[in-house]
């Protein structure tokens, strides 16, 4: 076959774009669920909103744990999917389900035994702690179901089954918003439960999500066939070793990033109330644009793993080049959309003149950042990591975020006393520090690692 810069495989595009669109919509709906919770609790009381936000700091770490153990599964399983070998995929999935189950039980016990210590780490306000305690008391039981659900969805994604995740997100949005509206405010004859109502809504949604995906895997799925044999219950020592080698760097990288996020938010939070408001508004729009980038990263990981599994090195390189160019194009489009809609978006808020001006400046900064982020994240976490090189992303994240960005941002904010836009530029500068090494690594093609074992 003649070598080409872009992939000419029609099946590649037929598989890529449905993945990208469906995962984008799923991410958008999931983000909207969180937004709806915040809006309804914010309208009920500030303490309820703050209490839920406090518990969500804990849940954010759990979400990232689910993402990283799922990503480790996808990296290996998608390569076996490229070879159409289902038994190793079922074995790896079974092993990761056991990890998720043990982690979920541990988290429930931790939150049951030490709720005060966990919540007290974030605030000393007794009113907020009381609301957070009521929320955590109910929500903690969803941690196990959430982790298991996400592992099952990751296994399905590794074999290019993503529509069920979108359907689940849609159902979860409707159920969660409906129950929250009913129980938070006490509508339709139900008692007014406030933050406890929000927790009950989330718990019911999580139970429903688990039931739907479990029934789908058992009764409907025709690819994974998870329980068609006893492979899911068998732990192969070699496969376990392969998973650990892949998942540990992914886990460390994900957790380091997850810990850095609230630290970056805290830096702006200690500058001024206008900075908090401006960052909140600008970040909301940025996150909505980011769902496409996250989807591209997820889709790229599956596509690259599948390509490497097939063993056609020329097609792997062509597919990677195609994806990287698409990443740059998507970044420029998203950045332009964010920039040209800033006036309309700002008109939806009532902010002080200072906060409005600051928000506009931050949106412009984030529109520019979007271009870099839309390249480095899908290439680094999608193409390179999806093709089997999980250690490189760990090194890049450690050095750029913890070695450069956080020290630079802390110095800019509290030592050099730079203006808030300059501090935000420092906080977002990891897109530059990550972008160059990721580009150079990408061009070397040393990231193509075969992870599958011969039959």
Identify the role of each PLM range:
Residues 1-23, 77-144, 192-247, 304-370, ...:
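Short alpha-helical transmembrane segments in multi-pass integral membrane proteins
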Residues 15, 30-31, 63-65, 71, ...:
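Hydrophobic alpha-helical transmembrane segments of integral membrane proteins
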Residues 25, 29, 33, 62-66, ...:
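Residue-level hotspots within pore-lining transmembrane alpha-helices
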Residues 28, 32-50, 119-126, 182-193, ...:
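Helix-terminus/linker motif at the lipid-water interface of multi-pass membrane proteins
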Residues 35-39, 151-155, 178-185, 214, ...:
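Alpha-helical transmembrane segments of multipass membrane proteins
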Residues 49-109, 146-165, 278-342, 373-396:
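Small-residue-rich hydrophobic transmembrane alpha-helices
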Residues 70, 139-158, 165-173, 198-214, ...:
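Short runs within selected transmembrane alpha-helices of multi-pass transporters and secretion channels
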């Amino acid at each position: 076959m003649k070598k080409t810069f872009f992939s000419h495989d029609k099946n590649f595009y037929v598989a890529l774009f449905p993945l990208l669109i469906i995962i984008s919509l799923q991410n958008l709906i999931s983000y909207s669920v969180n937004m709806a919770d915040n809006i309804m609790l914010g309208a009920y009381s500030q303490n309820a909103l703050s209490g839920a936000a406090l518990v969500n700091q804990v849940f954010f770490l759990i979400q990232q744990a689910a993402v990283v153990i799922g990503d480790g599964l996808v990296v290996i399983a998608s390569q076996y999917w490229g070879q159409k070998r289902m038994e190793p995929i079922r074995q790896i999935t079974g092993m990761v389900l056991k990890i998720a189950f043990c982690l979920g039980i541990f988290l429930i016990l931790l939150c049951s035994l030490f709720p005060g210590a966990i919540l007290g780490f974030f605030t000393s306000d007794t009113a907020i702690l009381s609301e957070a305690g009521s929320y955590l008391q109910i929500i903690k039981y969803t941690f196990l179901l959430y982790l298991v659900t996400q592992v099952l969805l990751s296994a399905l994604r590794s074999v290019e089954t993503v529509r069920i995740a979108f359907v689940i997100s849609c159902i979860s949005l409707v159920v969660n918003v409906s129950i929250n509206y009913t129980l938070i405010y006490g509508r339709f004859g139900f008692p007014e439960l406030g933050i406890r109502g929000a927790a009950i809504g989330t718990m019911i949604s999580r139970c429903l999500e688990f039931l739907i995906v479990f029934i789908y895997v058992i009764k409907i799925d025709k690819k994974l066939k998870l329980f068609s044999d006893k492979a899911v219950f068998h732990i192969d020592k070699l496969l376990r070793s392969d998973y650990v080698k892949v998942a540990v760097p992914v886990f460390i990288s994900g957790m380091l990033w997850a810990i850095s996020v609230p630290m970056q938010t805290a830096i702006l939070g200690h500058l001024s109330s206008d900075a908090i408001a401006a960052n909140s508004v600008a970040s909301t729009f940025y996150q909505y644009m980011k769902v496409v980038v996250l989807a591209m990263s997820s889709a790229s990981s599956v596509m690259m793993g599948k390509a490497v599994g097939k063993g056609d090195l020329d097609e792997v390189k062509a597919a990677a080049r195609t994806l990287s160019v698409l990443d740059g194009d998507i970044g420029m489009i998203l950045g332009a959309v964010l920039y040209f809609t800033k006036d309309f978006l700002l008109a939806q808020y009532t902010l002080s003149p200072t906060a409005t001006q600051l928000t506009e400046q931050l949106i412009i900064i984030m529109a520019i950042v979007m271009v870099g982020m839309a390249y480095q994240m899908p290439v680094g976490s999608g193409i390179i990591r999806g093709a089997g090189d999980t250690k490189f992303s760990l090194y890049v994240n450690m050095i750029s975020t913890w070695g450069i960005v956080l020290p630079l941002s802390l110095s800019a904010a509290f030592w050099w006393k730079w203006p808030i836009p300059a501090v935000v530029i420092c906080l977002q500068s990891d897109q530059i520090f990550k972008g160059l090494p990721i580009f150079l690594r990408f061009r070397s093609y040393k990231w193509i690692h075969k992870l599958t074992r011969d039959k």
